[in-house]
Amino acid sequence: MDYSIARRLMVEQQVIRRGVSDPLVVDAMMRVPRHLFVEEALWSQAYSDFPLPIGEKQTISQPFMVAFMTESLCLHGGEKVLEIGTGSGYQAAVLSQIVSRVYTVERLPGLARRARRILDSVGCRNVNIKLTDGTFGWEEESPFDGIVVTAGSPQIPHHYLEQLAVGGRLVIPVGNRGSQVLKRVVRTGVEKFSEEDLLDCRFVPLVGKYGWHEEGD
């Protein structure tokens, strides 16, 4: 299988055709080898139009959703961005092609180690991973020009708002465990925020003190 052709078709048919047009995002999606972020048995499906399992009840998001969420941050290049939920590392890799520095938080040690290994193997040297409860964000490195959350939350954790730079954007799925609305929050002033709904979505739960509890807890 020619993965470069599969990647080009993915971008043309799933990303551009659905309205994602930011050249920085399109170029990043073209450059990152998505198949390397899933198990080898799934490589043939890596560029298909659906999420894939990555272990520990987590998934790598659908390509369109990665592109759409990245575009929704309204990046120009050179920013500092926080990702909540490293997962496979794919979203962080896409962001790393655009911004100066990516800070990404993961609560599951196995996923964090695997993501670090893959990110290093594809040359993403501007990505820092922290193992912690993602609902706290990453206060020491704040403020951030953008924050993207790759798991669904029952509400917007206050730490994200506090760690957003003035003029910065937060993109987060908010709703119940089964379905959410993707929201964009813009910090328009020190104590001022605007919020808009972008689209309906479905993500794995954001687990943590200010998110969901583990099922069975």
Curated annotation (Swiss-Prot):
InterPro entries: PCMT, SAM-dependent_MTases_sf. One of its GO terms (molecular function) is protein-L-isoaspartate (D-aspartate) O-methyltransferase activity. Pfam families: PCMT. It is an enzyme of class 2 (transferase). Keywords: Cytoplasm, Methyltransferase, S-adenosyl-L-methionine, Transferase. The active site is at residue 61. GO terms for biological process: methylation; protein modification process; protein repair. It is found in: Cytoplasm. Its EC number is 2.1.1.77. It catalyses: [protein]-L-isoaspartate + S-adenosyl-L-methionine = [protein]-L-isoaspartate alpha-methyl ester + S-adenosyl-L-homocysteine. SUPFAM superfamilies: S-adenosyl-L-methionine-dependent methyltransferases. It comes from the Bacteria. Its main location: cytoplasm. The keyword Cytoplasm applies. Transmembrane segments: none annotated. Catalyzes the methyl esterification of L-isoaspartyl residues in peptides and proteins that result from spontaneous decomposition of normal L-aspartyl and L-asparaginyl residues. It plays a role in the repair and/or degradation of damaged proteins. This is Protein-L-isoaspartate O-methyltransferase. It comes from Syntrophotalea carbinolica (strain DSM 2380 / NBRC 103641 / GraBd1) (Pelobacter carbinolicus). The lineage of its organism: Bacteria, Pseudomonadati, Thermodesulfobacteriota, Desulfuromonadia, Desulfuromonadales. The gene is pcm.
